[in-house]
Amino acid sequence: EKKAARRRALIGEALALVGLSDRAGSLVGTLSGGMRQRLSLACALVHEPELLLLDEPTVGVDPELRRGFWEHFRALNRRGGTIVVASHVMDEADRCDRLALIRRGRVLAVGTGAEIRARAGVPDLEAAFLALAGSPGGEARQ
């Protein structure tokens, strides 16, 4: 009984976080692609994971939900959880504590966003990625 109540509470919290509380009784097949993406995140969060692997977690999500997601990710991290984010969105990557910029399977740089920007000598992470990637052929500058 207590376990079931806890599970229901976690499900409710996860659905609220991803903005799907009003769709709690819906069949997955009736949800849009974006809603399904958010539901996948909710399913992962219900289990209170110690390690959360996220691939483009906020692409296509409105700014209000995006802020809520990142607040939740930070809270999970403060409780000892580890979050690994794969993203092509540099603004999103810059929210992470540590980054590894990778191009074509090659690590270009590892560090905080500030460290990587300083190393590249540019003010933003996207410019740092482009500078460190070097030529269009993908050779990094030395």
Task: Label the predicted regions.
Residues 110-111:
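ABC ATPase "signature
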Residues 48:
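Conserved catalytic motifs of ABC-family nucleotide-binding domains
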